[in-house]
């Protein structure tokens, strides 16, 4: 077993031991924890671009991310529309409003923080929506992501000969990409044999096709983050997890997979 694979395995074990009990419990603790993870992910992206979070604009970006992530509709019940939409829109409007009164903060400056708050906040919000729908649905998504990552890594390491996206991620191969898809389909079939109700109203054959799509989406999410890191000239998104980089290095695929599963009506 290579050192990199040992690190991946160790992280997976620790993540399962810490994250899964909180995920299983759900509720406010999970919502706050995921909201803080989302804020940390946006902090990493702002830091990549050289933007400071200890500013009015930076704070607004972090609060907007938190507002989009947690299910505010459960707490702002007096509003006639979704609480997330209202809170996020208000904070983004304030952020745009600062461009009116500041000579050094333009619409172009505001565009990147707004984009990353939406990208990260929407992904983590979908994770919380999945948990509300059922613990098994979150597990299915996580297993698809982890199976894709592990199968792609092992297949690419042993059989990878053709580069997938050399400009963005030189180490990824087409063989690994295909291996990741097969790994996701296999874990989905096994999961549904154990829990046949997780993907209702879809059966195992259609879910196998969906799993292939989710695997592609997850690997695309990985490439998106790789492209951003290469653009900004950094190796990792952050240093939150020693030896593993930042939050986005671990959650990049999930930020795409969870919204896609929601789009397909799985929760």
Explain the meaning of each model-derived region:
Residues 147-157, 218-230:
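Short helical (or helix-break) motifs at transmembrane helix termini and adjacent helical loops
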């Amino acid at each position: 077993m290579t050192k990199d694979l040992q690190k991946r395995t160790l992280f997976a074990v620790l993540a399962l031991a810490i994250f899964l009990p909180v995920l299983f419990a759900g509720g406010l603790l999970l919502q706050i924890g995921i909201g803080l993870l989302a804020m940390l992910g946006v902090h990493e992206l702002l830091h990549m671009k050289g933007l400071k979070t200890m500013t009015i604009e930076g704070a607004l970006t972090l609060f907007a991310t938190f507002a989009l992530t947690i299910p505010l509709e459960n707490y702002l019940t007096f509003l006639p529309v979704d609480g997330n939409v209202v809170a996020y829109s208000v904070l983004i409007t304030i952020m745009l409003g600062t461009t009116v009164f500041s000579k050094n903060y333009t619409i172009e400056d505001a565009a990147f923080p707004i984009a990353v708050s939406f990208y990260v906040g929407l992904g983590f919000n979908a994770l919380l929506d999945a948990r509300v729908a059922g613990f098994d649905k979150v597990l299915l998504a996580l297993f698809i992501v982890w199976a894709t990552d592990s199968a792609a890594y092992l297949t690419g390491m042993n059989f990878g000969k053709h580069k997938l996206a050399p400009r963005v991620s030189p180490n990824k191969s087409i063989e690994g990409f295909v291996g990741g898809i097969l790994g996701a389909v296999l874990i989905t079939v096994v999961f549904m044999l154990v829990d046949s109700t997780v993907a209702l109203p879809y059966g195992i054959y259609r879910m196998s096709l969906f799993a292939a799509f989710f695997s592609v989406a997850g690997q695309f999410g990985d490439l998106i983050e790789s492209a951003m890191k290469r653009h900004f000239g950094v190796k990792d998104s952050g240093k939150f997890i020693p030896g593993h980089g930042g939050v986005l290095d671990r959650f990049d695929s999930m930020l795409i997979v969870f919204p896609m599963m929601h789009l397909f009506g799985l929760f």
